[in-house]
């Protein structure tokens, strides 16, 4: 019985590899098509296998103070929101084009991970996904503050999202447009050539 169970597991595993290989040969490696449920399952489970057990056991040394939470929130807005969106949904400009798509950080799939797992993913990234490494020397306080903020995402308020939008990266065009708006509102906008300064 034991030998037949092992044989069945091996056959199933080989069958799985053949199925994934056949799918890749048929569809190629394009990131345009939505991945199959099997591909998504394998990609998600790769995260768990990638994290060492001692890292999973780490606890966040940063107290959950308002200051630390705000630091994490603003850091997330500036560095993470392009892919994860300010609300952690993953519905962001770059996030929509990634494979696998960024997970919704508000959902149990992420919230049930240990602090150590989240920290490890932030610091080391995950191969074969769009998640890069943000490695730092030692135990980065910024990464631990991000863990605090990720825990807060399910309770994120509208006011916090508005504050975050001010810290999102901007293109040179966006910056120029903001500058022109500020100059106009402050009455310091340069006069366009050929336009009279005052009415006769």
Put a short name on every predicted segment:
Residues 112-161:
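Soluble extracytoplasmic domains of inner/organellar membrane proteins
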Residues 52, 89-91, 119:
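Short hydrophobic/aromatic-rich motifs at helix boundaries and adjacent loops
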Residues 63, 106, 132:
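Residue-level detector of conserved, well-ordered beta-strand and adjacent loop positions
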Residues 67, 73-100, 126-133, 154-159:
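Periplasmic/extracellular electron-transfer cofactor-ligation site
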Residues 40-42, 82-85, 110-111:
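A short linear-motif detector with a strong N-terminal bias
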Residues 101-112:
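Short microdomains enriched in Cys/His and/or Lys/Arg
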Residues 2-73, 113, 135-150, 166-200:
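Periplasmic c-type cytochrome electron-transfer domains
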């Amino acid at each position: 019985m034991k030998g037949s169970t092992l044989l069945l597991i091996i056959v199933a595993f080989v069958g799985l590899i053949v199925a994934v290989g056949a799918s890749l040969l048929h569809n190629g490696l394009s990131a345009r098509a939505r991945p199959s449920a099997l591909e998504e399952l394998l990609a998600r489970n790769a995260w768990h296998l990638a994290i060492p057990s001692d890292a999973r056991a780490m606890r966040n040394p940063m107290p959950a103070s308002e200051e630390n939470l705000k630091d994490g929130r603003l850091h997330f807005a500036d560095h993470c929101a392009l892919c994860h969106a300010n609300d952690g949904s993953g519905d962001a400009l770059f996030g929509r084009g990634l494979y696998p798509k960024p997970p919704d950080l508000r959902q149990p799939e992420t919230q049930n991970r240990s602090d150590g797992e989240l920290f490890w993913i932030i610091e080391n990234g995950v191969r074969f996904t769009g998640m890069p490494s943000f490695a730092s020397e030692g135990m980065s306080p910024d990464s631990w503050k991000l863990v605090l903020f990720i825990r807060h995402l399910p309770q994120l308020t509208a006011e916090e999202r508005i504050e975050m939008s001010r810290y999102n990266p901007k293109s040179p065009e966006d910056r120029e447009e903001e500058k022109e708006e500020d100059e106009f509102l402050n009455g310091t906008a340069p006069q366009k050539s050929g336009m009279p300064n005052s009415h006769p």
